[in-house]
Amino acid sequence: MKTNILTIIILSCVFSYGSQLAYADENLKDLKRSLRFAYNITPCDYENVEIAFVTTNSIHINTKQKRSECILYVDSIVSLGITDQFIKGDKVDVFGLPYNFSPPYVDNIYGGIVKHSNQGNKSLQFVGILNQDGKETYLPSEVVRIKKKQFTLQEFDLKIRKFLMEKYNIYDSESRYTSGSLFLATKDSKHYEVDLFNKDDKLLSRDSFFKRYKDNKIFNSEEISHFDIYLKTY
């Protein structure tokens, strides 16, 4: 009798553990599908455009282009205090991921705004290292190309994710990757981390994923030392 009870307990534990693994696997697949959909997007990318007006937490920009016979605007939502750095009439560069396309003549983004600087056609390149389960590989210098003296973490993040999606299929439902991080290192030994799997986000939507860019984190290209990407399969 005791043997039968023990067997039942063991089988129950095994079944419960297996169910938890299956549930976690499905959750990861859902997360990957949502990330693939969210980041498979064409960014708002404009140079030398003008700020129409600013509010407490938004920057409204006239792109001088037309969509649906109307002037196309970009409305950037930012954290409190960010708009103090900009005024009406400022010339800016925009690189942001739209989370809302309604109305059709306004693209809504979070952050993604830097003061315009005339960098010409010179592309900046960065040293990068990919670490997969402890195995390091130096990445080609053209993985991330940026033409601005200043850029946002949002732009760098998207270009890294695009590279990883195209080269390593990190967000494919059946891919072996379970987690990953991007570390952007500056010459004063500071590191800025981005969770490439957005595991802190409760809602699997563009709006939720892209809110992380509200702080409009800006880097000067001359400050960058290198970047590291860590991917894990366990």
From Swiss-Prot:
UniProt keyword terms in alphabetical order: Signal, Toxin, Virulence
Keyword Transferase tagged: no
Cystine connections: none
GO cellular component, one term: extracellular region
MF terms in GO: toxin activity
Pfam families: Stap_Strp_tox_C (PF02876), Stap_Strp_toxin (PF01123)
Residues annotated as signal peptide: 1-24
Miscellaneous information on this protein: Binds to major histocompatibility complex class II beta chain.
Chain's role: Mitogenic for human peripheral blood lymphocytes.
Record family assignment: Belongs to the staphylococcal/streptococcal toxin family.
Name recorded for this polypeptide: Exotoxin type G
Species this chain originates from: Streptococcus pyogenes serotype M3 (strain ATCC BAA-595 / MGAS315)
Gene for this chain: speG
